[in-house]
From Swiss-Prot:
Binding, substrate: 125-127, 162, 169-171, 222, 243, 249-252
Disulfide bonds: none
Binding of ADP, residues: 21-25, 154, 185-187, 211, 213-215
General function of this protein: Catalyzes the phosphorylation of D-fructose 6-phosphate to fructose 1,6-bisphosphate by ATP, the first committing step of glycolysis.
Gene of this entry: pfkA
GO MF assignments: 6-phosphofructokinase activity; AMP binding; ATP binding; fructose-6-phosphate binding; identical protein binding; metal ion binding; monosaccharide binding
Species of origin: Clostridium acetobutylicum (strain ATCC 824 / DSM 792 / JCM 1419 / IAM 19013 / LMG 5710 / NBRC 13948 / NRRL B-527 / VKM B-1787 / 2291 / W)
Subcellular localization, as worded in the UniProt entry: Cytoplasm
Entry binding sites for ATP: 11, 72-73, 102-105
EC numbers: 2.7.1.11
Domain of life according to the entry: Bacteria
Lineage: Bacteria, Bacillati, Bacillota, Clostridia, Eubacteriales
Name used for this protein in its record: ATP-dependent 6-phosphofructokinase
Enzyme class: transferase
Length: 319
């Protein structure tokens, strides 16, 4: 293993820079050359590749986003495009590729490995929607961003004695809503894994009002969606002023938390070690606090499980 490359793909996540830093500095320490690929698979296809050194990753561990930029690349679904990408890697003398991203990025790495490219994936996605690992890079920071918004919205909701519906990211996985709902003391959490009863929701709001609650916070995952429409319906039925807030892309930005910096650093080191061991088509994850690697085919085949215990806790503590 003489030269490896690293890229970030798909949606950005806080902690990606910490992972890049760990990959670059670990590889250099082990005598391996490192190249950076800009703009994900799109940049790989176009040969946007440059040499990296220790200085390339100075003062980036605290920065959100990704210094390598990122992009979505739908054309990577085509066999001829992936073949071109594999050829580009060979032309640049790259022996191994570290891919930092989510499900779609891992599928790209999986396809490249079938073409003889040694690949290792790091889970970089705020949604925490890769079931083979307990946590993904960026999830914890996003929770803290959402929690900050919840705290501020509670202040104004209490002042006006209103209902606040906060829509957070999470198209297929409701972990952001579920975890932030518990940590933020929300009265209701609505996630795609479990449907909700609108009448029951309104009943809970009214019962809370009778018990003297000064506000009511509802955390809604974008996979369920329709925060503005839901707010309108809630106000019509309950007669209580209701406002909706969509947090949007603010959830992707910001300096990564200590947890995400540690997680990304540990995973970055492990990725280089896995490549040096001659393994390929692997992904890095964390299980019960331990950094591990797993075959990418097996990882992508792990069914998504729903944490019913946490959901029950959210409901119990909200009353």
């Amino acid at each position: 293993m003489k030269t490896i490359a690293v890229l970030t793909s798909g949606g950005d996540a806080p902690g990606m820079n910490a992972a890049i830093r760990a990959v670059v500095r670990t590889a250099i320490e082990k005598g391996i050359n490192v190249k950076g690929i800009q703009r994900g698979y799109s940049g790989l296809i176009n040969g946007e590749i440059f040499d990296m050194n220790r200085h390339s990753v100075s003062d980036i561990i605290q920065r959100g986003g990704t210094i390598l930029r990122t992009a979505r690349c739908p054309e990577f679904l085509k066999e001829e495009v992936r073949q071109k990408a594999a050829n580009v890697l060979r032309v640049f003398g790259i022996d191994g590729l570290v891919v930092i991203g989510g499900n779609g990025s891992f599928m790209g790495a999986q396809k490249l490995s079938k073409l003889g490219v040694k690949t290792v994936g790091l889970p970089g996605t705020i949604d925490n929607d890769l079931p083979y690992t307990d946590y993904t890079i960026g999830f914890d920071t996003t929770l803290n961003t959402v929690l900050d918004a919840i705290n501020k919205l509670r202040d104004t909701s209490t002042s006006h004695e209103r209902v606040s519906i906060i829509e957070v990211m999470g198209r297929d996985c409701g972990d952001i809503a579920l975890f932030s709902g518990i940590a933020g003391g929300a009265e209701s959490v609505i996630i795609p894994e479990i449907g909700y009863d609108f009448n029951e929701l309104c009943k809970n709001i009214l019962e809370g009002k009778l018990r003297g609650k000064m506000h009511n916070l509802i955390i809604l995952a974008e996979g369920v969606g329709g925060a503005a429409e839901l707010a309108k319906k809630v106000e019509e039925v309950t007669g209580i002023e209701t406002r909706s807030t969509i947090l949007g892309h603010i959830q992707r930005g910001g300096s990564p938390s200590a947890f995400d910096r540690m997680l990304a650093s540990r995973m970055g080191v492990k990725a280089v070690e896995v490549l040096m061991e001659g393994k390929t088509s692997r992904v890095i994850g964390i299980k019960e606090g331990k950094i591990m690697d797993q075959d990418i085919d097996e990882a992508l085949a792990v069914p998504r499980s729903f944490n019913k215990e946490l959901y029950d806790i959210a409901n119990m503590l909200s009353k």
